[in-house]
Amino acid sequence: MDQLYLEIEISTQNAETTIYTSVSSFLALYTYRYLNEPKNIQVNFVATKIESGKIALRSSQLRRELTDQHITCREAAKLPAIRDLRLPIYEKDGNTFIAGTCAVCRELIARQPNTELRKLLGFKESCLLAPSEASIWTRFCEVDVVDVVSRLHEGLLLKAVPDEVVRFEQHMNEPVRMHNIYKQAREQANQTENGAKIKRKHRVQIDGRTPKEQLLIEHRFAEGISFTIADLILYPLLRIVFQHCGQMLPHFPLTSTWFSEIDSFDGTCAKILGDLYVPQAASQGEELLSIPDCDATSLYKADPKRYKPRNRIYTSQAEVDLALAKLSELQLVFSTDSEHTYGQQTIDWQKIEPTHAKSSALPQERLERKRQQLENMANAVVSLAQPGDRIVDFCSGTGHLAILLALKLPLCTIIVMENKSFSLAQAQKRALELELSNCVFYQCNIDYFVGRFDIGASLHACGTATDIVLQQCRRSVAHFVCCPCCYGSLQPMPHISYPLSQRFQRVLSTNDYLYIAHTADQAHEMGTTNCKPETTLQGLQCMSIVDTDRKLQSEEAGYQVILTRLKPEQCTPKNHLLVGRFVKQN
């Protein structure tokens, strides 16, 4: 039986007990109730101290679930995943654990045999499939609106309607984006009022040359004309937000219509919210709130209106030269030359992957280069590892590095972490074929991992992901082995700012740093098409600069760091390797 772990906090005052939960766990519980409490899923509650805004639950509605055998204390939990991941967590197949609001709610639905329920996952079951780092829409549902509700339950007093409400109203005013929209438009145009089809000779013709904006298809639900998991998540969140907004709902007619559509389509959405949620005492008066101005862009990534060239950073050679000149003040040598190498070839790939060379879609030469990259990474990790270590392969993909480490380090626990379900399933399949028992699989974003570990590894984690991995290693005082990638994709985040090291921060601004990072992506293999030697040499220099900054930041945190290159160097243009061993607490 699958397991669902939800976060609760038990508070007793004046002999009265109140059960609180986090917003994310509330959404998972809400989805579980909407699915009519499926028999193949057991709900478990994890007692902890909820850090952000907490929601009071109607405990009378949870008598069956809130029993001693289904409540555990997080610190005393026997299951490591409960301590490793942010709740809620979905466990399936005994060794796979899923974290993240949308991913957990999707899995609750996907594991149901009822095909009608699985239609909630949308076309090709892809609704909210992309992780929040890659999808503006997933981020809106999983992070932005959740954060608003959380802050409201921390006591936030509104002076204006939250931006997220305005953005959703604008989203509902955008043209519908859906698969086969022209077919849907033809069917809609050729139906009578009672739903019958119009005779062939009177049919309206609509072809692909008609602009989508002119198709008479309007948002009935959040993603178009079908009720999906996006509606299931947003409905309770926005209902709660409007409870804190006084009399503002009439000022958002499309959102109001959307609420009415859902209430008439399936009244259980409102009923479940009423059954589970204890409304806060009204803290907002009857006065009207102001409505903020927000850019009228859709919540989908591929929106031409979002492309604003003035807001993008373009790199001119003059700006690069100026940034490099500022760095000269530090009098540092930016080099990846090192006496330390990890390119020893000790792996019998035929034994590990007897049929992979034949079945792989990769050409033989590229397959060989990939194996060389993996061998360098594995050798570096082995040089740091001790029996009993917990080793995390961040951004693991289909698990090639993790599985190699599991084979080379049978006394260590290997955590395979990847946010794409399909890739993780491939990794599980290979681990099963090799009968590995020391692998655990976590489907989640890097930020959802909060556990302790001894070594962190990442092979070509894209852009800022490498810096998030390094940040995780510093948090856990863990050694690290990182081969960075996509330098030009570096972007500041709320918890990551550039430059990274104190020494770089003294001479470079964020824009200076990003000019250098963009230039680092010009490092191509010498002799390839369109490769200018002077441009490539400058790109290699900028790669060394960015990774030197990473090295300095780690050294400031008490690490001894080796910056070297993979061997042979031709195995990948992005061949830098950072190997860090924690030596002292500053």
Curated annotation (Swiss-Prot):
Recorded hits in InterPro entries, A to Z, give: Glutathione-S-Trfase_C_sf, Methyltranfer_dom, SAM-dependent_MTases_sf
Specify the GST C-terminal domain's residue ranges. 121-276
Q: Which superkingdom is the protein from?
A: Eukaryota
Question: Which GO terms of the cellular component aspect does the record hold?
Answer: cytoplasm
Q: Which CDD domains match?
A: AdoMet_MTases (cd02440), GST_C_family (cd00299)
What family name appears in the similarity comment?
Belongs to the GSTCD family.
How is this protein named in the record? Glutathione S-transferase C-terminal domain-containing protein homolog
Native organism: Drosophila pseudoobscura pseudoobscura (Fruit fly)
Q: What is the lineage of its organism?
A: Eukaryota, Metazoa, Ecdysozoa, Arthropoda, Hexapoda
